[in-house]
A protein has these predicted regions:
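The feature captures the catalytic groove of carbohydrate-active enzymes
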Residues: 34, 40-49, 96-143, 148, ...
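Long, well-ordered core segments of solenoidal/helical folds
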Residues: 21-26, 77-90, 149-164
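Acidic/polar, glycine-enriched structural segments that form the non-catalytic walls/loops
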Residues: 1-49, 69-73, 81-88
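Long, structured ligand/cofactor-binding scaffold of large enzymes
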Residues: 44-50, 58, 64
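Alpha-helical packing segments of well-folded alpha/beta enzyme cores
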Residues: 14-17, 21, 75, 79, ...
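Alpha-helical support elements that line or immediately flank enzyme active sites
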Residues: 21-24, 56-70, 120, 124-139
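Structural recognition of the beta-strand scaffold that forms the well-ordered cores
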Residues: 22, 61-62, 70-74, 80, ...
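Solvent-exposed, acidic/flexible segments
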Residues: 4-11, 15, 52, 56, ...
């Protein structure tokens, strides 16, 4: 699946190099690579964590579509390990059931950065990778592993969507990170197009 032949040898070489790099850093199912990938510093930018607004999800799509599922599966670990905490966050902060994730996750259920930044979509964004993975492979063992997470994401949106005049709306979810000052100046975000797309796919 991952073999290609291109007219441009430089692009072809970069394609294989990108696969090699991704596979090299994404072999341990408990410790996927962080936002910086292969780079490390004493004081890493963005806390060196898993930023789950899109940064963590995107590289794994490349691995999945080329058939490298063993290397793409580590994507799921930070989400699955934090389910209990995110369920509690949802109950305390939003007063309903479901999985509500902060923006920055660490390994083994660690919240390394408890910022929400008026975003409700990180959990469903991660769910899409799981849905794509199952859609490509129809791997039932994988589906059983991620089903509780997907169910928790569904519970969240069933409770959080706001119905007005027979139409459901996404309220309080920004397309991008929003500060409290931004919300004061511009109002509560509603119906961000990315989240609408995630929900339609979900």
């Amino acid at each position: 699946v991952s073999e290609i032949s291109l007219d441009d040898p430089v692009i072809e070489q970069r394609y294989y190099l990108s696969k090699y790099m991704l596979a090299s850093v994404s072999r341990d199912p408990e410790y996927p690579p962080n936002i910086l990938g292969i780079s490390t510093f004493d004081r890493p930018a963005w806390n060196g964590n898993y930023k789950i607004n899109y940064n963590h999800q995107s590289p794994y799509l490349n691995l999945m579509v080329s058939g490298h599922f063993q290397q793409s599966d580590p994507h799921d670990a930070p989400y699955l390990k934090l389910m209990e905490i995110s369920d509690e966050m949802c109950k305390r902060l939003l007063h309903h059931e479901g999985l509500y994730y902060p923006l920055g996750l660490g390994p083994h259920g660690l919240v390394s950065e408890a910022l929400l930044l008026h975003m409700k979509s990180p959990a469903i964004h991660g769910a899409l990778n799981m849905i794509y993975r199952y859609g490509i492979t129809e791997d039932e063992a994988y589906a059983q592993k991620v089903y509780p997470y997907l169910r928790g994401v569904a519970d969240f949106w069933e409770k959080d969507l706001v119905c007005r005049d027979g139409v459901y709306h996404v309220v309080g979810d920004g397309m991008h990170e929003r500060t409290d000052g931004n919300i004061r100046d511009n109002g509560v975000p509603e119906n961000p197009v990315n989240t609408l797309g995630y929900l339609k796919t979900f």
